[in-house]
């Protein structure tokens, strides 16, 4: 019930966070748990709201993902968030260098 109250932006971020923490797309998780037909249906529905359940997370190539990673790491540093080892760790200083070069 709680997930039904997400805004479009919150839903997009949740899809990215699921991939960040598991290394598996939301589409593949739904496919494993509910089957391919349901995963296809859910992804088709998500596309009406400008979302894609196959979206991954890569702060090296996507500026939005970089901002999300920055917020997460600051939240952990400042003890607002509990640390949970992600599927893949990112060095925030290296990410900043990458994005400074791209600007």
What are these regions (language model features)?
Residues 27-94:
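Long, amphipathic alpha-helical surface segments
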Residues 1-28:
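Mid-length scaffold segments of soluble, non-membrane domains
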């Amino acid at each position: 019930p709680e997930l039904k109250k997400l805004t479009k932006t919150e839903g997009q971020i949740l899809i990215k966070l699921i991939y960040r923490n598991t290394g598996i797309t939301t589409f593949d998780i739904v496919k494993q748990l509910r089957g391919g037909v349901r995963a296809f249906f859910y992804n088709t529905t998500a596309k009406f709201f400008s979302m894609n359940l196959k979206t991954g997370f890569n702060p090296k190539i996507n500026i939005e993902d970089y901002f999300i990673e920055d917020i997460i790491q600051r939240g952990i540093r400042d003890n607002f968030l509990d640390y949970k080892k992600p599927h893949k760790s990112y060095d925030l200083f290296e990410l900043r260098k990458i994005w400074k070069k791209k600007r």
